[in-house]
UniProtKB/Swiss-Prot annotation:
Residues 1-94 are annotated as: Domain I, interacts with DnaA modulators. Pfam families: Bac_DnaA (PF00308), Bac_DnaA_C (PF08299), DnaA_N (PF11638). The keyword Transmembrane does not apply. Domain I is involved in oligomerization and binding regulators, domain II is flexibile and of varying length in different bacteria, domain III forms the AAA+ region, while domain IV binds dsDNA. This is Chromosomal replication initiator protein DnaA. Belongs to the DnaA family. InterPro entries: AAA+_ATPase (IPR003593), Chromosome_initiator_DnaA (IPR001957), Chromosome_initiator_DnaA-like (IPR020591), Chromosome_initiator_DnaA_CS (IPR018312), DnaA_C (IPR013159), DnaA_dom (IPR013317), DnaA_N_dom (IPR024633), DnaA_N_sf (IPR038454).
Length: 451
């Protein structure tokens, strides 16, 4: 039996969930709102232009095909627009601040937000690795409580900017509504507050406080793992805030479904809104971050030196800033100019560690394990797609993550010519723009190699 219009979109989602990765599904398709008010047309509302463009480019044809097949209507048209579905879903909460019951609507005292005023959108350096996260964070700050992005779940490795964005969202909300009750808290501090409340017999006050918030920002939610009592209480707080349209923003070092010993009901709720990854910054972004930080600290950092540091240190923003602070302090103490030679000497231990962590051999091993092939296959001559593509990817990663020259990389891949390596790098760069699955593989491998 063909689904009626009210259930067609849900049927589409169920089918599409089996066709694309869970990360892509949660990021791009799940937040869309479907409207059937126009005959023979499904209008999908995206929360911002960035999501609309991505859906148009990567998923619209697939969406249209599935919708036509499920509806039995070959003339059905699927469109994507930026905005909110005209008629709100009855089951969904309204946007902040139209919330609270009569008792909660009483005037609330101002609370301490624990936000860092230095972490704002204006000084967050944007690049390809964090572009989507930056866009959705801004959207949440502008329209807190919007159902399509509530909760907002940001995940990625240590030192990539999750906490900065978390504070930027909170500061953005407060800049638009100074009376908003916004709280930033680390997961460990939440647990400690709860322990204290139980000890002091003040759980009622604890619950009342958290349920009075307009926006709750919890950092490093993965620390709730194994803490059954904490998870139980947070479950009820989450439900109360979500059901009344208050904004929830969470960060973690991993995708919610990958957090072990966290209740399934919490994992499910964390995926109700928008889940977005922050990847390790690419070279251009690393250089931009260094130059921005140097400008903020009034440090003269020549661009070629920033480029040198960015090439050598590839892990995260925190390491880049630490390196800059060390270079600046040593230069000031010694009265020396900041040159490439000076940086090489000052950071020699950090650079040696980085070179030791990421080698061509290590990349080959990780890529081989990822694609379930042998390292010898990567060094061989097989032109089979199942071997050639991972080989090209491993070459491109070697160029990106190590300081080896093209001839040196080629030598490690069975004495391949440097032009073969160059072709592989260009091919992978091209395919990353065209095939989202390859871009996801690239990001997963970068993340693994950057640990």
């Amino acid at each position: 039996m063909k689904p009626d219009l009210s259930s067609l979109w849900q049927e589409c989602l169920l089918q599409l969930q089996d066709q694309i990765s869970l990360t892509d599904f949660s990021t791009w398709l799940r937040p869309l709102q479907a409207d059937f008010s126009v005959q023979n047309t499904i209008v999908l509302y995206a929360s911002n232009v960035f999501i609309k463009q991505k859906v148009d480019e990567s998923y619209l044809a697939q969406l249209t095909k599935v919708a036509q097949e499920l509806s039995g209507n070959a003339e059905l048209v699927v469109q994507v627009k930026v905005g909110v579905k005209p008629e709100p879903k009855p089951a969904q909460p309204s946007a902040l601040p139209t919330h609270h019951n009569k008792e909660e609507n009483k005037p609330q005292t101002v609370i301490r937000s624990y936000l860092n005023p230095k972490h704002v959108f204006e000084n967050f350096v944007e690049g390809k690795s964090n572009q989507l996260a930056r866009a959705v964070a801004q959207k949440v700050a502008d329209n807190p409580g919007e159902p399509s992005s509530n909760p907002l779940f940001l995940y990625g490795g240590t030192g990539l900017g999750k906490t900065h964005l978390l504070h930027a969202i909170g500061n953005g909300i407060l800049s638009r509504n100074t009376n908003a009750r916004v709280l930033y808290i680390h997961a460990n501090n939440f647990m400690q507050q709860m322990v204290n409340a139980v000890r002091d017999n003040k759980m009622d006050e604890f619950k009342k406080f958290y349920r009075s918030l307009d926006a709750l920002l919890v950092d490093d939610i993965q620390f709730f793992a194994e803490k059954e009592k904490t998870q139980e209480e947070f479950f009820h707080i989450f439900n109360n805030l979500f059901d009344t349209g208050r904004q929830i923003i969470l960060t973690s070092d991993r995708y919610p479904k990958e957090i072990e010993k966290l209740e399934e009901r919490l994992k499910s709720r964390f995926g109700w809104g928008l889940t977005t990854a922050i990847e390790p910054p690419e070279l251009e972004t690393r250089v931009a971050i260094l130059l921005k930080k140097a400008e903020e600290k009034n440090i003269y950092l020549p661009e070629e030196v920033a480029f040198f540091i960015g090439q050598k240190l590839r892990t995260n923003v925190r390491d880049l800033e630490g390196a800059l602070n060390r270079v600046s302090a040593n230069a000031e103490f010694m009265g020396a100019a900041i040159t490439i030679d000076f940086v090489r000497e000052t950071l020699k231990d950090m650079l040696a560690l980085q070179d030791k962590l990421v080698t061509v051999e290590n990349i080959q091993k990780v890529v081989a394990e990822y694609y379930r092939i042998k390292v010898s296959d990567l060094k061989g001559k097989s032109r089979s797609r199942s071997i050639a593509r991972p080989r090209q990817l491993a070459m491109a990663l070697s160029k990106e993550l190590t300081n080896r020259s093209l001839p040196e990389i080629g030598k490690n891949f069975g004495d391949k010519d440097h032009t073969t390596v160059l072709h592989a790098c260009r091919k992978i760069a091209e395919l990353r723009e065209q095939e989202h699955s390859l871009e996801e593989d690239w990001s997963n491998l970068i993340r693994t190699l950057s640990v």
